[in-house]
Amino acid sequence: MLFRRFKMVLCECGGYQSIDEPMATAEGGQRLPLIVVMTAVLRLFKEEAIAHLSSLSEVARTVEDISWVLTIPAIYDDYSKRFMRVAAHKAGIISTVDSSSLQLCLEPEAACLAMTSSEAPHLARPGTKVMILDCGGGTVNITTHEVLSMDPLRLKEMLPPTGGAWGSTCVDSAFMKWCEDFLGDQHYTQLRGTASFYNLLTQWETGKTAFGGGQDERIRLNMVEVSRHGDIDDSKMQELRAAFNDGQPPERHVKGTKLIVVLPSSLVRSFFDPTIANIVNCLRDTRRNPLFGRLQYVFLVGGFSSSPLLQAAARTELEGEGCAVVAALRPGVAIVRGAALFANNAEVFTTRKARLTYGVISSIVYNHRNPEHVHRRTASPVFDDDGKEMIDTFSSHIKVGEDIPQDGVCPVQSYVPVLRTQSEIFFRVLASHKSNISFPDKDATFPVGEVTV
């Protein structure tokens, strides 16, 4: 079974409760629990890493000899981060899920380390505000930082990480939708998953990477191998070209002779436009945030960032007013280099911003004059030892956008039992995307854990 882009399952669907719940779908339609697929991949990485390190010395290496760093998209939520730790544990990388031998590093943070430490150290100085635009295959992740010092390097997060599922595979999906429309459902179904299909994708990848959106640019596709899966000869290919062009504006007409199909610039650009529009809108919203202030540098990293079309869009949106867009010399390697730096220098990020509001359900005295209390009164009220009716409330410990202490410890809050005879207190830990939450309503909060004291 061949699984592609399975990492995106954790980005595309939320609300999972169990680690075994997400499913990965293979090219042939077969389904397996995502944890099985992810564990197999991480186990392979582990075995390859140990074999390589062992080959460099006369001593056989084990997992205990290695400090592991697993890079993840910045848009992964708490569930997804826990999922990756469980997968690493099942793969034998760590002995316990919470082992300190494994660190999770956000991909744009790794890139930020690489850019400020090695690729562009001359650009960063104390007070400099930078944005990392990490454009990969599946996701686009954006983090924003202020340089506090250079020796030692210390960075402060300005805004919570943001981004979305707008990687280069979205452009690939648009191209594959065109293939389906062009060839027809029957021919496309016969082609999908074959070696000829991946040969076509390789041709597309070559053209996509270099495409800059110029009016005279074209992408040429050799359909010889494709033709073998649908008895498509030169005459049939001409019919397919004519059928597609019918109803299309002239600038989107495909051309070519025999089994060659040439995609015009306007058509290729239409594959990019929705994805780049999503990225630009996110960049615009981030830069306009009043909490961020003046931006000096934007570092472009990730494989998709090498796209001339994407680079031009980022520069059009961000450059000016003292801001410069800097593309990494080796955009696909920046995250790997940064992860290696992160392994020994995780404390470089002195302050991070909370992406969610976290708190617990506690109790307050019911007030019949408060309409919010009346609205939330239950059919089976709870009373304290003094006979006072109690109602659930939300007690926040940290709010979205607030600084997370470097040691992860929030200010202490005190709670007392509703009944003096209680021997334990049960807390339900909730999170919310909103800042000001007073009550644990289901449409405003969601559960993340439980604690019994």
Question: Model-flagged regions — what are they?
Answer:
Residues S117-E157, F175, Y358, N370:
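Gly/Thr-rich phosphate-binding beta-strand-loop-beta motif of the actin/hexokinase/Hsp70
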Residues L10, P33, P73-I75, W166-R315, ...:
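Gly/charged contiguous loops adjacent to phosphate- or pyrophosphate-bearing nucleotide/cofactor binding elements
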Residues R82-A87, S305-G322:
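Conserved helicase motor "Helicase C" RecA-like lobe of SF1/SF2 P-loop NTPases
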Residues I232-P274, I279, F349-V453:
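Acidic low-complexity intrinsically disordered segments
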Residues G92-L106, A110, A314-G338:
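Conserved phosphate-binding/catalytic loops in two-lobed NTP-binding clefts
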Residues M1-E21, V97, Q103, R154-L155, ...:
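Early-domain small/polar-rich strand-loop-helix modules and first-structured segments
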Residues F3-I132, A195, N199, G213-G214, ...:
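Nucleotide/phosphate-binding catalytic cleft detector across ATP-hydrolyzing
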Residues A40-V59, A110-P121, P126, H253, ...:
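Phosphate/ATP-binding catalytic cores across multiple sugar-kinase/actin-like superfamilies
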